[in-house]
């Protein structure tokens, strides 16, 4: 997909904003209390640390999956379900330092009887995560907003729901995506 200015600048801002927000929020994740204004100011310096002991500016699993989705969408004209699933599987195979439970359950494609990656992931997701309203699909969705900007509303919604269905098939998650 080719973007022209100012759309390119907007797309870059959306993607970088999501990644910076992820790195800032990582400091506050699992804090166990409501963050204070001082906590928020500190988080915006991207200090790292937190429960996950991240390096300064390091993104979490949410940011890593955002990048995996962005890479899968780069040259696609239609939502590439199988290619997206393979990018997600490549990511989970890299032994990431943190993975949300619903995401892990959906992406576990080990064992015999493999079908295509997206069918296996969607089957796992329906089996294990149908009742889950976790936010893992939403956390990686910024590339969808960029990629679907050229589509009509129905096509954009279908792409977002298809992506959510790979790991978070609950209808609330699909529509939130």
What do these predicted ranges mean?
Residues 1-177:
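Structured, active/binding-site neighborhoods that engage oxygen-rich ligands
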């Amino acid at each position: 997909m080719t973007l022209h200015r100012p759309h390119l600048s907007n797309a870059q801002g959306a993607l970088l904003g999501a990644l910076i927000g992820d790195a800032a929020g990582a400091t506050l994740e699992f804090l166990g209390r409501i963050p204070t204004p001082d906590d928020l100011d500190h988080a915006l310096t991207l200090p790292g640390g937190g429960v996950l002991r991240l390096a300064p500016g390091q993104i979490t699993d949410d940011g890593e999956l955002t990048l995996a989705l962005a890479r899968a969408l780069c040259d696609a004209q239609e939502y590439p379900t199988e290619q997206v699933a393979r990018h997600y599987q490549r990511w989970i195979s890299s032994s990431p330092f943190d993975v949300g439970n619903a995401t892990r359950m959906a992406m576990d494609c080990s064992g015999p009887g493999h079908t295509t990656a997206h069918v296996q992931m969607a089957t796992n997701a329906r089996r294990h995560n149908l009742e889950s309203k976790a936010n893992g699909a939403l956390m990686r969705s910024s590339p969808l907003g960029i990629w679907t900007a050229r589509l009509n509303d129905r096509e954009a919604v279908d792409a977002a729901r298809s992506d959510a269905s790979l790991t978070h098939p609950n209808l609330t998650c699909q529509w939130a995506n």
